[in-house]
């Protein structure tokens, strides 16, 4: 990829729609089939799409516990440390009900959702971290029923995924994936309970099903390909940056990587190191396609221009690896998560840092946020007025109702004034 100056990049920068519209009829048919035929449809789709025969959709509590008990100690400790850090961070940011003075007449109270479905991807890799980064949040929120769905595998669901479900006290785990699992969580089947909200990343079928069913069920987001944008200078460890780029690229051929810098020579040096390391990289087929088609080097003329490019991209992950990263914290506004300094690589945020790795993609960071414990709470506004307060504001209320020609609204006020 040739180096672009900031203006050249901004002139050509665009993101394709994250979803393939041609999938719509397929998604609609899958959802309808699950709505009508329930578990029978799910087993059929497991065979058709995942080439796995599943006599029992639910994985028993005994199997989940056995997965944890038999897990090697190092993996168990790593998952446990991740869980503890996520739990501590989410507890620190959880919205709580405040003890209020009697004179407070308008306030908010929070309640946990009753039931949540979590989609845990399968296929190209196993993702116990997704369980930790979603189910822990629901647990901290106080969600009563946490349900995980994950695609069936010929050799069974990943033991690491099941162990993470045990650690986070997930209530039920079902081996079903794709759009059909989202439909099952939305409508309910003979085996899978209907939930109030569905969270977790997935492929285009999962994303489109969430979009299609939103309104009948709550969702976290419609995720596109993963992405990272880095701002670097001559103090950055370029060999480390190479693997920050590769780490993102290995997720998906469509993963997008951007490197921004004010020093053109640093960017050229980085690109030569990427080219040198690429032939021997793990997961070469995926990484090489991502680098060939979705990798950008952007030369910014100054600090403000670098920040402007970053805010325009509005990436899922932003990494600042410069001699003085502090000023970027205020200036870089629209990102899913902001990783500051050499010892805060994006990858540590994928696993153990604390905040959830479920983050907005495809420029949606310009108007939405990463998943947090507060996404598993409802917020109710309470209005409890005294007679004195009512009398102070009633005339304004009834007059606005009159202006809007909503006379029953007006009468609701007037009858209380008489």
Swiss-Prot record:
Q: Does the keyword NAD apply?
A: yes
| Cofactor list | Zn(2+)
What GO molecular function terms would the record report? Answer: histidinol dehydrogenase activity; NAD binding; zinc ion binding
The entry's NAD(+)-binding residues are 119, 180, 203
The record's Gene Ontology cellular component field reads: cytosol
Which residues does the annotation say bind Zn(2+)? 248, 251, 350, 409
Entry-linked InterPro entries? Ald_DH/histidinol_DH, Histidinol_DH_CS, Histidinol_DH_monofunct, Hstdl_DH
Pfam family for this entry, one: Histidinol_dh
Q: Which residues bind substrate?
A: 226, 248, 251, 317, 350, 404, 409
Q: In which pathway does it act?
A: Amino-acid biosynthesis; L-histidine biosynthesis; L-histidine from 5-phospho-alpha-D-ribose 1-diphosphate: step 9/9
Q: Which UniProt keywords apply?
A: Amino-acid biosynthesis, Histidine biosynthesis, Metal-binding, NAD, Oxidoreductase, Zinc
> What Gene3D superfamilies does its record include?
1.20.5.1300, Nitrogenase molybdenum iron protein domain
Question: So what does this thing catalyse?
Answer: L-histidinol + 2 NAD(+) + H2O = L-histidine + 2 NADH + 3 H(+)
Superkingdom field? Bacteria
Q: Which GO terms describe its biological process?
A: L-histidine biosynthetic process
Q: Which family does it belong to?
A: Belongs to the histidinol dehydrogenase family.
The record's listing under PANTHER family reads: HISTIDINE BIOSYNTHESIS TRIFUNCTIONAL PROTEIN (PTHR21256:SF2), HISTIDINOL DEHYDROGENASE HDH (PTHR21256)
| Name of this protein | Histidinol dehydrogenase
Q: What is the lineage of its organism?
A: Bacteria, Bacillati, Bacillota, Bacilli, Bacillales
> What's the gene?
hisD
């Amino acid at each position: 990829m040739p180096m672009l100056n900031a203006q050249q990049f901004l002139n050509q920068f665009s993101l394709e729609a994250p979803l393939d519209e041609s999938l719509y009829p397929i998604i609609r048919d899958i959802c309808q089939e699950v709505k009508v035929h329930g578990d029978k449809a799910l087993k059929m789709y497991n065979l058709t799409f995942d080439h796995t025969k599943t006599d029992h959709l639910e994985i028993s509590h005994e199997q989940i516990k056995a997965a944890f008990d038999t897990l090697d100690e190092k993996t168990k400790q790593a998952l446990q440390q991740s869980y503890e850090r996520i739990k501590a961070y989410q507890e620190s940011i959880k919205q709580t009900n405040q003890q209020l003075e009697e004179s407070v007449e308008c306030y908010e109270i929070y309640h946990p959702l009753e039931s949540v479905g979590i989609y845990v991807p399968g296929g190209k890799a196993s993702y116990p971290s997704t369980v930790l980064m979603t189910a822990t949040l629901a647990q901290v929120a106080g969600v009563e029923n946490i349900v995980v769905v994950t695609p069936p595998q010929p050799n069974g669901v990943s033991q690491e995924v099941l162990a993470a479900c045990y650690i986070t006290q997930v209530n039920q785990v079902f081996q079903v994936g794709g759009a059909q699992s989202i439909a099952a969580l939305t409508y309910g089947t003979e085996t899978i309970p209907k939930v109030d909200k569905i969270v977790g990343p997935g492929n285009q079928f999962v994303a489109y099903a969430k979009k299609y069913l939103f309104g009948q069920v709550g969702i976290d987001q419609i995720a596109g390909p993963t992405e990272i944008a880095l701002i670097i200078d001559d103090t950055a460890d370029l060999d480390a940056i190479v693997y920050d780029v590769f780490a993102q690229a290995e997720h998906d051929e469509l993963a997008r990587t951007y490197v921004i810098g004010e020093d053109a020579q640093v960017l050229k040096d980085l690109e030569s190191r990427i080219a040198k390391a690429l032939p021997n990289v793990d997961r070469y087929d995926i990484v090489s396609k991502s680098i060939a088609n979705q990798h950008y080097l952007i030369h910014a003329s100054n600090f403000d221009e670098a920040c402007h490019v970053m805010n325009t991209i509005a990436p899922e992950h932003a990494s600042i690896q410069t001699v003085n990263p502090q000023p970027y914290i205020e200036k870089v506004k629209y990102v899913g998560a902001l990783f500051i300094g050499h010892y805060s690589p994006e990858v540590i945020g994928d696993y153990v840092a604390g905040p959830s790795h479920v983050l907005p993609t495809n420029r949606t960071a310009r108007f939405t946020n990463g998943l947090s414990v507060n996404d598993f709470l409802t917020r109710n506004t309470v209005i409890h007025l005294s007679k004195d307060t009512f009398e102070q504001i009633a005339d304004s209320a009834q007059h606005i109702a009159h202006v809007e020609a909503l006379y029953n609204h007006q009468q609701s006020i007037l009858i209380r004034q008489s």
